[in-house]
Amino acid sequence: SREIIKTNVDKETGDAVRKLELPGVKVDEDYKRYYPYGSLASKVLGFTGGDNQGVIGLEVQYDAYLKGTNGKILTMTDARGVEMENGAEDRIEPVAGNDLRISLDMEIQQYAEQLAYQTLEKKNAKKVSIIVMNPQNGEIYAMVNVPEFDLNDPFTPDQNLRSESLRNQAAERDKTVKQQELLNAMWRNTCINDTYEPGSTFKIITAAAGLEEGVVKLTDPFSCPGFRVVEDRRIRCHKAGGHGAEDFTKALENSCNPALMEMGLRMGVDRFYQCFSDYGLLSLTGIDIPGEAGTIMHKLDKIGA
């Protein structure tokens, strides 16, 4: 019978065992995925595990498409498992996996990662994410989540992440940090797995919906006193004292809260919410990377006028 003593040893270890020439001990070679660009787009591409199976990212999404089928040699053996000298033999040829062509542009990805790391250092941030997309067809040209990790060494936790986790869990009884939790945090694609409040970028949606629904024109006047009262809340504009008189274009340029709130109110809840649906804000994008988070939009019955 055959017993596997250890798998996934490095070449140096395998060569050392061979030199010992131990009776009955055989070293089999296997293939391992190598990533020539190291950490580039690590959380998008993903990596393979010890058995060359996809673990995260595109590697796991397209695992069955990429991995192919191993070949086999079938031979006849005696009761002791010894191959018979003149026994029949049947060979099953291996089938190579498929190639996968994706929309990422390496130069754009590298440049975006460079900018992200500069921002990470300048702002002393914990992480920075960037997406570069073709607005006409949704193709992703770059998806950055820094700090990225080395795809050729994916099971070594980032030291900064390790230190942060130790500080966060200092109150725990045993003060230990699970290795898998650290790795999951390091591998997390925040562009896909997390949700964010869009903030003032959502004003583009409000303005476009207002124009589409015909409740506002480019020349419509607005007045910004610096705030607007909604129910029991006073929602302020970012400019103290307000922007004063402004038209639609200027209000959008100024990112004026009261003016954009007025546009939303003119549409009413039902029409405004329908625009959310029409723009695809209530559904997933369907990107072919595992773990896309759902919407954080409120339900229709939870929105007031």
Question: Where on the chain are the PLM-derived regions?
Answer:
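Small/polar-residue-rich segments within soluble enzyme cores
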Residues: 1-97
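Beta-lactam-recognizing serine transpeptidase/beta-lactamase-like catalytic domain environment
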Residues: 78-88, 104, 136-201, 205-305
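Conserved, well-ordered alpha-helix/loop/beta-strand core segments that scaffold catalytic motifs
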Residues: 2, 85-128
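Extracytoplasmic/secreted envelope proteins and their assembly/folding machinery
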Residues: 14, 18, 41-45, 55, ...
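Short, small/polar residue-rich loop motifs at catalytic or cofactor-binding pockets
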Residues: 70, 124-127, 196
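Short, glycine-anchored, charge-dense loop/turn motifs used at functional sites
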Residues: 112, 130-141
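Short N-terminal helix-loop-first-beta-strand/juxtamembrane motif that initiates sensory/input modules
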Residues: 23-27, 121-135
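Extracellular/periplasmic catalytic domains that process cell-envelope and extracellular macromolecules
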Residues: 35-38, 93-94, 123-124, 134-135, ...
